[in-house]
Amino acid sequence: MAPPPLLPVAASTPILHGEFGSYPANGPRFALTLTTQALHIQRLRPKPEARPRDGLVSLDEVSGCGTLQSRSPEDTAAYFCIYTYPRGRRGGRRRATRTFRADGATTYEENRAEAQRWATALTCLLRGVPLSGDQEITPELLPRKPRLLILVNPFGGRGLAWQRCMDHVVPMISEAGLSFNLIQTERQNHARELVQGLSLSEWEGIVTVSGDGLLYEVLNGLLDRPDWEDAVRMPIGVLPCGSGNALAGAVNHHGGFEQVVGVDLLLNCSLLLCRGGSHPLDLLSVTLASGSRCFSFLSVAWGFLSDVDIHSERFRALGSARFTLGAVLGLASLHTYRGRLSYLPATTEPALPIPGHSLPRAKSELVLAPAPAPAATHSPLHRSVSDLPLPLPQPALVSPGSPEPLPDLSLNGGGPELTGDWGGAGDAPLSPDPLLPSSPNALKTAQLSPIAEGPPEMPASSGFLPPTHSAPEASTWGPVDHLLPPLGSPLPQDWVTIEGEFVLMLGILPSHLCADLMAAPHARFDDGVVHLCWVRSGISRAALLRILLAMEHGNHFSLGCPHLGYAAARAFRLEPLTPRGLLTVDGELVEYGPIQAQVHPGLATLLTGPAGQKPQA
């Protein structure tokens, strides 16, 4: 019986096609087709399937790949392995590894070359390197691995950041072959101090594993350097392990994934980080009442939202649920605030990002940041992950390709030790193929240091580092705010002013206010505007609750509530006229009083992964 025709591939160019076996050797055989969007799998023998189950592996679900070899010297086959994170029936992701046997040649060297050809092609596609069907696939096509500095706040959210980082983040980015150093922060503004003295030429990106507060420290540290114009071009990223995780929610939305929270959001953002790619990021330069200045990537809030944010700190152990509880309490004691909001309306044309700050998505390797000014002082990297083999959990491999763990296979070459369900005591450690991950200029894979065996001890009184809510340190460097007159000076005539009683005022840059609150559904990372939302007094508690509930899916503006207002602006000034209240910038409490801000389009660079996919069910 002739095998069925090949499955129709996606509307993209086929890169490779071939026949592979599985492990063990007497298992099924498969026809594999690699396109720019997916790996197509069709079983050929013993029973061909016209539409095999799990026959399409989207590259959006793949973190990395590798080649393996048998521990048996008589086995001349080589093995091609991919690490995937498909969505389960309940929506969450689960790790699955698929392994295929390259056995079409008579010698191990030839089979190994074929397995490496597939691994090289898949790695190039994952990292954004364009390939064509008639192109020769060689290791020289592989981009250099970016070297990432990963900062973990072990006190963030519910205090689970370190454990989640080791359980989910480290294994995935190790599978992707990324090079990184892992550092635990130990106090407030520790991350800011680190990046202020960082040698930028040693890194291609800084990633925070926490909530939005740690990235706020990093961003303001980069902009508080004499070489801020170079420093702010350092790509920054966030892996959510905090309470709000607003920017991570926006990154998840930008990547085309459905809205999720918790570990699912962490896995989605980790996958996007592994894929590479970045996007220009607008920043707000915020001038406070004292004249000091800080920079925001998220929001300025006054009224109900800032009250909920700050007053819910006492429920920090609840994680993101603290905001729900805080909102309920806030609705029960709803306050109004008198103030004056003035803004410079955005032009009809979208603002263009600053030239030179955009990273081409076609090349996944990150642009090297320029070296810092000679005057910068290098701070020691405390609790760094740097010098010992990095443990990488390896659960059982699943079909198609490998229906069971592979006790008799090992990854080719030498490198970090991989532990898990790969055999009994005395088996050789698993290690990545040295020819696969990178070109000859590749950086060394990250490794673990003895001082990073666990998170620092948390205060016994509360279990978490108590937030100080002191005013953030002001930045003395940064771009000129050419749209803003000094606070207290009259505003130009082209500004619009609204005065009255407000329940809340929000100026937000990205789409999300929390991981599951889409406050500005049409916002983009580089649209050049701040999205102003306000709610006037007179609104009922029920109507405000409806707005908050609709905000989960970004439908609040379609409610037609007359108390809800919106404007897109390039700059704004907020003057609270009520003597007492709370103001927050990116969730951090700042001094109360007049405040103004200006958008600086595309000033920073955000690690986002590829964009353009539709939300996945």
From Swiss-Prot:
Q: What SUPFAM superfamilies does the entry give?
A: NAD kinase/diacylglycerol kinase-like
Task: List the induction conditions.
Answer: Expressopm decreases upon treatment with 1-methyl-4-phenyl-1,2,3,6-tetrahydropyridine (MPTP) which is used to induce Parkinson disease in mouse model.
Which residue ranges are recorded for the region named Required for binding to sulfatide and phosphoinositides and for membrane localization? 1-140
Q: Which reaction is the catalytic activity of this chain?
A: a sphingoid base + ATP = a sphingoid 1-phosphate + ADP + H(+); sphing-4-enine + ATP = sphing-4-enine 1-phosphate + ADP + H(+); sphinganine + ATP = sphinganine 1-phosphate + ADP + H(+); (4R)-hydroxysphinganine + ATP = (4R)-hydroxysphinganine 1-phosphate + ADP + H(+)
List modified residues, type Phosphothreonine.
T377, T578
Residue ranges with Gly residues bias? 412-426
Quaternary structure (record)? Interacts with histone H3. Interacts with HDAC1, HDAC2, MBD2 and SIN3A. Interacts with EEF1A1; the interaction enhances SPHK2 kinase activity. Interacts with PHB2.
- Protein name, UniProt field: Sphingosine kinase 2
State the species of origin: Mus musculus (Mouse)
